[in-house]
C-alpha cells in the first residue's frame, strides 16, 4: 500500500510495505523471496540444523514463521454457503423502473441515471455443504451481490430460488442442523431432513422447487437469482413501497436432471466454478438483467398470502417484473481467499433509498449475517479491500484484532475518537430527504402470520411444471423418502396431497415402488474398488 493511499490513517501504517513496494535492500530484486518481516530468504529448501543430519534449532525463525502461518491459513468456513466462487463486474442502470422514472419509487442514486455504472463483486455458492463439496448436489444456490455505490456499499444477498423453507428466522438454526450431516455419522440423512420438514408445512413450496430440476442449476451462468425477502424502496418524499428483486440470466436458464448431475460429478465436481472462471477468461462475460416487483406498502388482505412471507412468490400477472438494469461479470479474482472467501455480505447493508420491511426472515438475517462475519473474518472485516466501500470512510470505531488503519480523515485531531465534539472529529451528515417513518402498532406476541396458506402455491407450481419436470420431482422425492420413518413419510404425503391430489398420489406410489425395489435387493454392504497387488 503506497504512502498516498495511507494519508490520514495514522502513523502506525504510513509507508507500510508490500509485494508491489519498490523499496529493496542492497542486492535484492523485486522478485526476491522474503519473510513477513522483510528479511531476504537465502535458502528455502533446507532447515537450519546441527550438521546435515542433526536436530533443528529453536531459533530457526524462518521455519517457525513459515510453518506457524501455514497452521493458521484457514479461517472458519461459512456455516452456510461455504463452497463459493466470485467475480467482479459492473451494474448499469436504466434510470427507469419498467417505463416509469425510477425516482417515483426510490431515491437510491445507483438507479437514477440511464447508463450509470456501479462496480460490483458477486459470490455464487452452494448452501449446505462444505468448502470443497461437489457443485452438483441438490441444494439451493447463493447469489450475493455487493454494489460499491457512491453512497457506500449495498449488499443484495439472495438465492437462485425465489422463496425459502421457513418464514421466521427463529427456526433457521434448526433448519440448517437438519440439512447438515448427522452429528453421529457425519453423513447427510434424508430422514433428518424430512423430519424437520414434517413439522414445517410452510417448506412444502420450497421442497417442490428444490427436488425438481430447479434444485440443481446446470451452472452459475445459467442460473436465476432472487433477493428472496421483501424489501422497501423509499423516494424523495419519504414514501415507501414493497419490492422484490429478481436476476434473470441473459444466457438463459438451464438445469440438470439427477442423472445428468451424476454424470457431471463423475468427471468434475468443480464444474460450476470452472465454467464461470473459464467463460470470463475467454471474454464470454455473463450478464443478468435486474427486475423488481413493486407493491404498495400494507397488509393486502385481498391476497391469499402475506406479502412479507418469504415462502411465497408474488404472482407476475398481478405484480409484473420491471427492468431496472443489467449486471456484467468481466473479471476473475486475483486471489480466491483474499477476495471470494473474505468477501462478507449482509442483508442489513443498504444505502439511502433502500429500506427494510417487516419480513421476519429478513430481520433475522440482518443480525446473523454481519454477526457471523465478525466471527469468521474478524471485527475489522470491513477494512479488507474486498469489503471496504469505494468512498470516504470516517468513524469512531477503533482498535480490535487486525486493525489495518484508523478511520480518521486527513487533519483530524487524533485525540478525538468520540462524537459529538467541538474540537474535531467527523460530523453528522445533513439529511437530504425525509426519512421513511412507517407506523407500527400492536401487542407484543409470539404468533404465526394470519394467512400461512402453506400448500396453495406448491400445488400451483406442481401443475405448472412441464411433464418431465414433474416426473423428475416425483422420482427425486420418492428416492429421498423411501426407507425413512413411516411417520415422516405419512406427514409429507399429507402435505403433498394438500398441495395437489395427483402430487401426493404419485409420490406415494413412487415410495412404494422404491421400497419394493430396495426390499428385493440384497442388503449386503457394498465393497468398492478392485483388489490391489502387493507394493514393492
From Swiss-Prot:
Region annotation (Disordered) ranges: 1-54, 419-439, 515-536
GO cellular component terms, semicolon-separated: cytoplasm
Catalytic activity: 2 H2O2 = O2 + 2 H2O
Regulation acting on activity, per entry: Strongly inhibited by sodium azide and sodium cyanide, and slightly inhibited by 3-amino-1,2,4-triazole.
Pfam families: Catalase, Catalase-rel
UniProt-listed InterPro entries: Catalase, Catalase_clade1/3, Catalase_core, Catalase_haem_BS, Catalase_immune_responsive, Catalase_sf
Subcellular location: Cytoplasm
Residues at the catalytic site: 81, 159
Basic and acidic residues bias: start-end ranges: 428-439
Record's keyword terms, sorted: Cytoplasm, Heme, Hydrogen peroxide, Iron, Metal-binding, Oxidoreductase, Peroxidase
Biased composition, class Polar residues, residue ranges: 29-50
Taxonomic superkingdom: Bacteria
E.C. designation(s): 1.11.1.6
Keyword S-adenosyl-L-methionine in record: no
Binding of heme, residues: 369
Single annotated GO MF: metal ion binding
Matching CDD domains: catalase_clade_1
Gene Ontology biological process terms, A to Z: hydrogen peroxide catabolic process; response to hydrogen peroxide
UniProt cross-references to PANTHER family, sorted A to Z: CATALASE (PTHR11465), CATALASE-2 (PTHR11465:SF23)
Function: Decomposes hydrogen peroxide into water and oxygen; serves to protect cells from the toxic effects of hydrogen peroxide.
Family that this chain belongs to: Belongs to the catalase family.
Subunit structure as annotated in this protein's UniProt entry: Homotetramer.
Name of this protein: Catalase
Gene that encodes the chain: katA
Amino acid at each position: 500500500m503506497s504512502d498516498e493511499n495511507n494519508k490520514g490513517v495514522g502513523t502506525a501504517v504510513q509507508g507500510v510495505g508490500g509485494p508491489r513496494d519498490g523499496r529493496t535492500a542492497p542486492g535484492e530484486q523485486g522478485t526476491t523471496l522474503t519473510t513477513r518481516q522483510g528479511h531476504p530468504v537465502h535458502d528455502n529448501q533446507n532447515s537450519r540444523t546441527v550438521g546435515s543430519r542433526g536436530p533443528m534449532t529453536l531459533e530457526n525463525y524462518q521455519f517457525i514463521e513459515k510453518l506457524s502461518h501455514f497452521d493458521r491459513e484457514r479461517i472458519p468456513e461459512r456455516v452456510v454457503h461455504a463452497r463459493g466462487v466470485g467475480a467482479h463486474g459492473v451494474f448499469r442502470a436504466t434510470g427507469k423502473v419498467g417505463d416509469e422514472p425510477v425516482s417515483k419509487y426510490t431515491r437510491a442514486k445507483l438507479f437514477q441515471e440511464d447508463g450509470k455504472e456501479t462496480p460490483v463483486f458477486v459470490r455464487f455458492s452452494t448452501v449446505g455443504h462444505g468448502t470443497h463439496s461437489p457443485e452438483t448436489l441438490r441444494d439451493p444456490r447463493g447469489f450475493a451481490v455487493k454494489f460499491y455505490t457512491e453512497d457506500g456499499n449495498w449488499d443484495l444477498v439472495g438465492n437462485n430460488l425465489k422463496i425459502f423453507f421457513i418464514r421466521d428466522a427463529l427456526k433457521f438454526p434448526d433448519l440448517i442442523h437438519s440439512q447438515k450431516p448427522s452429528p453421529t455419522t457425519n453423513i447427510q440423512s434424508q430422514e433428518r431432513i424430512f423430519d424437520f420438514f414434517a413439522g414445517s408445512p410452510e417448506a412444502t413450496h420450497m421442497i417442490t422447487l428444490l427436488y425438481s430440476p430447479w434444485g440443481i442449476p446446470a451452472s452459475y451462468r445459467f442460473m436465476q437469482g432472487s433477493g428472496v425477502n421483501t424489501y422497501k424502496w423509499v423516494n424523495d418524499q419519504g414514501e415507501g413501497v414493497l419490492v422484490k428483486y429478481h436476476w434473470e440470466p441473459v444466457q438463459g436458464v438451464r438445469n440438470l436432471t439427477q442423472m445428468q448431475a451424476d454424470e457431471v460429478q463423475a468427471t468434475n465436481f468443480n464444474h460450476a466454478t470452472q465454467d464461470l472462471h473459464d467463460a470470463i477468461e475467454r471474454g464470454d462475460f455473463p450478464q443478468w438483467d435486474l427486475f423488481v416487483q413493486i407493491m404498495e406498502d400494507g397488509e393486502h388482505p385481498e391476497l391469499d398470502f402475506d406479502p412479507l412471507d418469504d415462502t411465497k412468490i408474488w404472482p407476475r400477472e398481478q405484480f409484473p417484473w420491471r427492468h431496472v438494469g443489467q449486471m456484467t461479470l468481466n473479471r476473475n479474482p486475483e486471489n480466491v481467499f483474499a477476495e471470494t472467501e473474505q468477501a462478507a455480505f449482509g442483508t442489513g447493508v443498504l444505502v439511502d433509498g433502500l429500506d427494510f420491511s417487516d419480513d421476519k426472515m429478513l430481520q433475522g438475517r440482518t443480525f446473523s449475517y454481519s454477526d457471523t462475519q465478525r466471527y469468521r473474518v474478524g471485527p475489522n472485516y470491513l477494512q479488507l479491500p474486498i469489503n471496504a466501500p469505494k468512498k470516504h470512510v470516517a468513524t469512531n470505531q477503533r482498535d480490535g484484532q487486525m486493525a489495518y488503519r484508523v478511520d480518521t480523515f486527513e487533519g483530524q485531531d487524533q485525540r478525538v475518537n468520540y462524537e459529538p465534539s467541538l474540537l474535531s472529529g467527523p460530523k453528522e451528515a445533513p439529511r437530504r430527504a425525509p426519512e421513511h417513518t412507517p407506523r407500527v402498532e400492536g401487542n407484543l406476541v409470539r404468533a404465526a402470520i394470519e394467512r400461512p396458506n402453506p400448500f396453495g402455491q406448491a400445488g400451483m407450481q406442481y401443475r405448472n411444471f412441464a411433464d418431465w419436470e414433474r416426473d423428475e420431482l416425483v422420482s427425486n422425492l420418492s428416492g429421498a423418502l423411501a426407507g425413512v420413518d413411516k411417520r415422516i413419510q405419512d406427514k409429507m404425503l399429507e402435505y403433498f396431497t394438500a398441495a395437489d391430489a395427483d402430487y401426493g398420489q404419485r409420490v406415494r406410489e413412487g415410495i412404494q415402488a422404491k421400497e419394493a425395489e430396495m426390499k428385493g435387493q440384497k442388503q449386503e454392504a457394498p465393497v468398492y474398488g478392485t483388489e490391489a497387488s502387493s507394493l514393492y
